[in-house]
């Protein structure tokens, strides 16, 4: 099974397809709850790849949020309350964005991204967060 996953990752990497996947198109949470948004990374060198997270609010430009380079290199945003955190799980080749203490203004579409072939940035499909 591991060999199949590696082969698929390599083929997708060569053709530049399917490098990132956000399986949930949308998630709904209530105010003051937390949410986790996952991004599966189909790259042969996941452990050395920095995963970047962005959001886009309705009718606004992309906003850069956070990146994670290794499992121990999280860069929390939001002071002591850690409003936004990012992490990597090497076993599942997944990066997770966690947004805590949700407010209505957190409503947006969230995207993971990686740099591919130098300076070419590849984005996943995005996950729309709805806060009620």
UniProtKB/Swiss-Prot annotation:
Organism: Mus musculus
Location of region: V segment: 19-114
Database matches in SUPFAM superfamilies: Immunoglobulin
PROSITE patterns: IG_LIKE
Keywords associated with the record: Adaptive immunity, Immunity, Immunoglobulin domain, Receptor, Signal, T cell receptor
Tree of life domain: Eukaryota
Signal peptide: 1-18
Region (J segment): 115-132
GO cellular component: a single term: T cell receptor complex
Gene Ontology BP terms: adaptive immune response
UniProt cross-references to SMART domains, sorted A to Z: IG, IGv
Protein name: T-cell receptor gamma chain V region DFL12
UniProt cross-references to Pfam families, sorted A to Z: V-set
InterPro entries cross-referenced by the UniProt entry: Ig-like_dom, Ig-like_dom_sf, Ig-like_fold, Ig_sub, Ig_V-set, TRG_var/const_region
């Amino acid at each position: 099974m591991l060999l199949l996953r590696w082969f698929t990752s390599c083929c997708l990497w060569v053709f530049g397809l399917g490098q990132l996947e956000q399986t949930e198109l949308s998630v709904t949470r209530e105010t003051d709850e937390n949410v986790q948004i996952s991004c599966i990374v189909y790259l042969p060198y996941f452990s050395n790849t920095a995963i970047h997270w962005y959001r886009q609010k309705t009718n606004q430009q992309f906003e850069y949020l956070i990146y994670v380079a290794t499992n121990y290199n999280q860069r929390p945003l939001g002071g002591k309350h850690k409003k936004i955190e990012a992490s990597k799980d090497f076993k599942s080749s997944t990066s997770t964005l966690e947004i805590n203490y949700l407010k209505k203004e957190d409503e947006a579409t969230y995207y993971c991204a990686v740099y591919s072939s130098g300076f070419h940035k590849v984005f996943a499909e995005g996950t729309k967060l709805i806060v009620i």
